[in-house]
Amino acid sequence: MTSSIFRTIGIIGYSRHPKAVHTYDILYHWLYSKGITVIIEHHAASLLNVQKAVVGDLNDIGNYADLAIVIGGDGNMLRAANILAQHDIKVIGINRGTLGFLTDLDPNSALVELSDVLSGHFINEKRFLLDVTVQRYNKLIRLGSAINEVILHTNTIRDMIEFELYIDDNFIFSQRSDGLIISTPTGSTAYALSAGGPILSPTVDAILLVPICPHTLSSRPVVINSKSIICLKFSKVTSELKIGYDNQTPVLVCKEEEIFIKRSNHYLDLIHPNNYNYFKTLNIKLGWSQNIAETKK
C-alpha cells in the first residue's frame, strides 16, 4: 500500500471502446490496491463488472473526491469540466481519444505518472471558464459555462449573421459573417484554431474573439482582457440563430435578446505530471517540425 495525498478519487469515462473500458478497469483495481476510496461515475461503472463499487454522478465526485481522473478524449474532459469546475477538486486526464490537449497522460505510462501525482509531485493549472447569459424580457438568464469556447452560429450553412459586438459597453464593430467564436486560452487550440485564430498559452489572462468566415477582409481575430464583458446584439435575424458552448446543446436566440459573455468565477483545477510542457505538447499534437539540433542527430 502506497501513501497518497488524495484519499478519495473519482473515475470518469464515457467511451465504450474496449481499450477505454480496459483502462477504467485497470485504474480502478490499481487505486483500490493502494487503499484509496474510489468513486466510479455511472457511465464507466455500467461498463465494469466490479462488485460493491461506490458509484455516483459528477456532483458526487466533486463533493466527496479530492481528485477526478477523466479517461477519454478532450470531449470527455469538456463534458465533465463544467460540473467539476463548480467544486473544490483537482482533475487529470488519461488520453483515450485523438489529440488529447486536456487528457494528456499516455495510457501506456499513466500508472507510472499517476504514482508521482499521488505522491504530490505535479504541476497545477487553473483554467478559467466563460459564463453565458441572455437578456430576455428584461431579465438576465444564465445559459451555461464553457471551458473551451462560446459559438454564435446559424442553423444552416447558407445563411449569414448580422450582429454588433460591444466590449464593456463600448461599441467595437458590426459584422456579417457565418458566426463568432469567443474562446478561452484553453479553447484556442480547438475550433478557434481551425477558424484562423492564434494559440494562447493556457496561463494568458485573455479572451479570444475569432470571426467565422467574415464578409470583409478587415475582420481579424482579436485578443482582449479576460475581465472584459462581451455583449452581442442583433439588428436583424433572418434565420435560426443559436449560441452554443463547448459540446452542449445550442440555445436558440431571438432578435430582441442580447447575449453576454464574461469570465466565470469558477475554474477547472487541472493538474499534470512534473514533466509536462505545454509547448512540447503543441509540438507533438500539431506535428511541428523538430529543432535543428535534433535533426542533426
Curated annotation (Swiss-Prot):
Residues annotated for NAD(+) binding in this entry: D74, G75, R79, N148, E149, R176, D178, T189, A190, Y191, A192, L193, S194, Q248
Catalytic residue list: D74 (proton acceptor)
Highest taxon in the source lineage: Bacteria
GO biological process, one term: NAD metabolic process
Cofactor: a divalent metal cation
GO MF annotation list: ATP binding; metal ion binding; NAD binding; NAD+ kinase activity
Keywords, ordered alphabetically: ATP-binding, Cytoplasm, Kinase, NAD, NADP, Nucleotide-binding, Transferase
Gene Ontology CC: cytoplasm
Class of the enzyme per the UniProt entry, highest EC level: transferase
Pfam families cross-referenced by the UniProt entry: NAD_kinase, NAD_kinase_C
InterPro entries for the chain: ATP-NAD_kinase_N (IPR017438), ATP-NAD_kinase_PpnK-typ_C (IPR017437), cNMP-bd_dom (IPR000595), NAD/diacylglycerol_kinase_sf (IPR016064), NADK (IPR002504)
Subcellular localization(s) per the UniProt record: Cytoplasm
The keyword Kinase is assigned to this record: yes
Catalysed reactions, as listed in the record: NAD(+) + ATP = ADP + NADP(+) + H(+)
UniProt-listed Enzyme Commission number(s): 2.7.1.23
Family, per entry: Belongs to the NAD kinase family.
The protein's role, per its UniProt record: Involved in the regulation of the intracellular balance of NAD and NADP, and is a key enzyme in the biosynthesis of NADP. Catalyzes specifically the phosphorylation on 2'-hydroxyl of the adenosine moiety of NAD to yield NADP.
Protein name, as recorded: NAD kinase
Originating organism: Blochmanniella pennsylvanica (strain BPEN)
Phylogenetic classification of the source organism: Bacteria, Pseudomonadati, Pseudomonadota, Gammaproteobacteria, Enterobacterales
